[in-house]
């Protein structure tokens, strides 16, 4: 058996939800005028309050104008907040994470992860996770731009990249660019042709 749903003429929600709109008094007046059974079911005998509000609303249009102004301000604030969130999301999606492999002494190297501060990731916690997951030394340091980066000892750039991809995907940032740079590769010397000394 289907039940007919009544929608409020003031806030356009079912009367059960009118109390969440901030227009409860006007909603009660509308419901009392249009569906007294439902009004009695929801609010009981609240007739005196409804009559008082109806009289005041009938006498003064300032209440409606003020309510409309407040509603417009609220809509503007919501639109601003939404656009701010969209800009923040676009900034996060357009930023990139750089995983740089750098040479240390002899054949040792380290991996530096930069660009994660945009995604509100706790760097110290991430460093501890890397240290325990990869069984290696790991620390947080600041680069020349005064931004934090995670320094991991060892040649584990691929494993770190896979972990960061999974971490960003978990946060809902699947389209973020993760770039791997190998600064440890030595430039090959171009062979120079030397002429043997004349004998």
Swiss-Prot record:
PROSITE patterns: SUI1. InterPro entries: DENR/SUI1_TIF (IPR050318), DENR_C (IPR046447), DENR_eukaryotes (IPR005873), DENR_N (IPR048517), SUI1 (IPR001950), SUI1_dom_sf (IPR036877). Keywords: Cytoplasm, Ribonucleoprotein, Ribosomal protein. Belongs to the DENR family. Interacts with the 40S ribosomal subunit. PANTHER family: DENSITY-REGULATED PROTEIN (PTHR12789:SF0), DENSITY-REGULATED PROTEIN HOMOLOG (PTHR12789). This is Translation machinery-associated protein 22. It comes from Eremothecium gossypii (strain ATCC 10895 / CBS 109.51 / FGSC 9923 / NRRL Y-1056).
């Amino acid at each position: 058996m289907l039940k007919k749903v009544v929608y409020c003429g003031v806030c356009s929600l079912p009367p059960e939800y009118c109390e969440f709109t901030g227009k409860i008094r006007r909603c009660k007046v509308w419901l009392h005028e249009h569906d007294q059974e439902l009004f009695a079911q929801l609010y009981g005998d609240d007739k005196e309050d409804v009559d008082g509000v109806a009289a005041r609303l009938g006498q003064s249009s300032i209440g409606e104008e003020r309510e409309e102004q407040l509603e417009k301000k609220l809509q503007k604030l919501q639109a601003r907040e939404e656009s701010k969130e969209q800009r923040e999301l676009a900034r996060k999606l357009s930023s990139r994470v750089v995983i740089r492999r750098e040479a240390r002494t002899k054949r040792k190297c380290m991996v530096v992860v930069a660009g994660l501060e945009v995604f509100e990731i706790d760097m110290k916690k991430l460093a501890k996770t890397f240290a325990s997951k990869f069984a290696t030394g790991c620390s947080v340091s600041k680069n020349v731009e005064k931004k934090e980066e995670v320094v991991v000892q060892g040649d584990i750039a691929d494993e770190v990249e896979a972990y960061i991809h999974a971490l960003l995907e978990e946060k809902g940032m699947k389209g973020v660019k993760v770039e791997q740079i190998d600064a440890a590769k030595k430039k090959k010397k171009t062979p120079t042709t030397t002429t043997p000394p004349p004998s």
